[in-house]
Amino acid sequence: AYERQFYPGATSVAENNIGH
């Protein structure tokens, strides 16, 4: 999730919360 936080469209809702 951390490396994908720059690509919100590729993250799930849960990962998006972790990334941001």
Curated annotation (Swiss-Prot):
The keyword NAD does not apply. It catalyses: coenzyme B + methyl-coenzyme M = methane + coenzyme M-coenzyme B heterodisulfide. It comes from the Archaea. Its cofactor is coenzyme F430. Keywords: Cytoplasm, Methanogenesis, Transferase. Binds 1 coenzyme F430 non-covalently per MCR heterotrimeric complex. Coenzyme F430 is a yellow nickel porphinoid. Methyl-coenzyme-M reductase is activated when the enzyme-bound coenzyme F430 is reduced, probably to the Ni(I) oxidation state. One of its GO terms (cellular component) is cytoplasm. It is an enzyme of class 2 (transferase). Optimum pH is 7.0. Its main location: cytoplasm. Belongs to the methyl-coenzyme M reductase gamma subunit family. Component of the methyl-coenzyme M reductase (MCR) I that catalyzes the reductive cleavage of methyl-coenzyme M (CoM-S-CH3 or 2-(methylthio)ethanesulfonate) using coenzyme B (CoB or 7-mercaptoheptanoylthreonine phosphate) as reductant which results in the production of methane and the mixed heterodisulfide of CoB and CoM (CoM-S-S-CoB). This is the final step in methanogenesis. This is Methyl-coenzyme M reductase subunit gamma. The lineage of its organism: Archaea, Methanobacteriati, Methanobacteriota, Stenosarchaea group, Methanomicrobia.
